[in-house]
Amino acid sequence: MRANPLFTVLLAAACGLFPAVLRALDKNDIEFARPNDRPLLLDLHVPDGAGPFPAAILVHGGGFDAGTRKMYIVPTFEVLSNAGFAWFSIDYRLAPEGNFPENVHDVESAIRWVRAHAGEYRINKSKIALIGESAGAYLVDYVGTHQTPETKVAAVVSFYGPANMLAQAEMHRDHPEMFDQAAIRRHPNGGLKAFGVKDLDEAGASRLRQISPINAVHKGEPPFLLIHGNKDEQVPYSQSPAFCEAIKNAGAQCDLITIEGGHHGMGNWKEPNQQHWKTDMVAWLKKTMKVK
């Protein structure tokens, strides 16, 4: 009597002889931290397969007082998904509720959470990148230049971030409450106050230098990729070449991608000659994190 091939396959699968097929996973509204009883949530995507996958933690912008995990950073979702990366898009406390360094601590909490749940979500803990844009870029720049064993990442991708906060403030010396972006002035505790600075005087300038990632670069930090439009009207393009040069001078790795004619925000990069950041970013991440 000849065996039925289909029956044989089904029996083998039932007996665990064939590995189960692990499907892609998309989950929303996952709590990753609760500072002062305030739940912080993330959305995630995990690709098809057993993994372990490289992953990215995504940090949105919005002038430190606006934005969510579902805004501004969204163009990276499809890019990373199509490249076989898992990703985790996070919220963090916004001014005036969450000033510096509370927002930094929230990003660090997200790193610890992803590392702690790496097995559950099929993540390679040694291949986690931080990706941030605008205000979120400042946060990933800061975390990347101040990493600890618990918050260590393999790479940082920073889109048009203000790495030199004093230079950013000097742009608006006559209106220091607007030193980052116009949005933050909506709150009485926003602007310079959100960073522990009362006035743009000598003490204030010293404080801004102290919290600027450009002044914290060191040889042991993770590799950085900076992506910036050279027509940015909110965070000057000059911020990124200066930051990248400082990183390289410190003995660490940095690469810069310039978006010709690009204004502030990846969502504004709609021209065909501005789309290369997608393939360039993926290629850089794979090379830097040794992803096959």
Locate each region found by the language model.
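Bacterial N-terminal signal peptides
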Residues: 8-19
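Alpha/beta-hydrolase superfamily serine-hydrolase fold, recognizing
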Residues: 22-292
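Positively charged n-region of N-terminal signal peptides that target proteins for export
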Residues: 1-6
